[in-house]
Curated annotation (Swiss-Prot):
Its cofactor is Mg(2+). Binds 1 Mg(2+) ion per trimer. InterPro entries: PTS_IIA_lac/cel (IPR003188), PTS_IIA_lac/cel_sf (IPR036542). Residues 4-102 form the PTS EIIA type-3 domain. Its main location: cytoplasm. Gene3D superfamilies: Phosphotransferase system, lactose/cellobiose-type IIA subunit. Keywords: Cytoplasm, Magnesium, Metal-binding, Phosphoprotein, Phosphotransferase system, Sugar transport, Transferase, Transport. This is PTS system lactose-specific EIIA component. Homotrimer. One of its GO terms (biological process) is phosphoenolpyruvate-dependent sugar phosphotransferase system.
Length: 104
C-alpha cells in the first residue's frame, strides 16, 4: 500500500470515527434532556459508524498480514487515533447515559 492509499484510508477512518463521535456527543445531550430512547438510537447509529471505520482498519491489517508494505502517513495515524478515542467514548457513553437515567 503506497502513501496515497494509506492517506485515503486514514481519511475514511477519520470520517467514520468523526461521525460516530458526533452521534455519541448528541446522545449525551439527549440523555441530559431525558430523551433516553433517542440517546440509545444515537449510540446504535454511532456503533454502525464505528463498525465501518473498523472495517477500513481491518483491511489495512489484512494487507499487512499478507506481506504488503504499508507506507504510514500522518493522516492514517490520525485516523487510528480518532477511532480508538471514539471507541473509548462509546464505552463511557453507555455508563454516562445510565447515570442520567438513575438521576431522573
Amino acid at each position: 500500500m503506497n502513501r496515497e492509499e494509506a492517506t485515503l484510508l486514514g481519511f475514511e477512518i477519520v470520517a467514520y470515527a468523526g461521525d460516530a463521535r458526533s452521534k455519541l456527543l448528541e446522545a449525551l445531550n439527549a440523555a441530559q434532556a431525558g430523551e433516553y430512547d433517542r440517546a440509545e438510537e444515537l449510540v446504535a447509529a454511532a456503533d454502525d459508524c464505528i463498525v465501518d471505520a473498523h472495517k477500513a482498519q481491518t483491511s489495512l491489517l489484512a494487507k499487512e498480514a499478507q506481506g504488503d508494505d504499508i507506507e504510514l502517513s500522518v493522516t492514517l495515524m490520525h485516523g487510528q487515533d480518532h477511532l480508538m478515542t471514539t471507541i473509548l467514548l462509546k464505552d463511557l457513553m453507555k455508563h454516562l447515559i445510565e447515570l442520567y437515567k438513575r438521576g431522573s
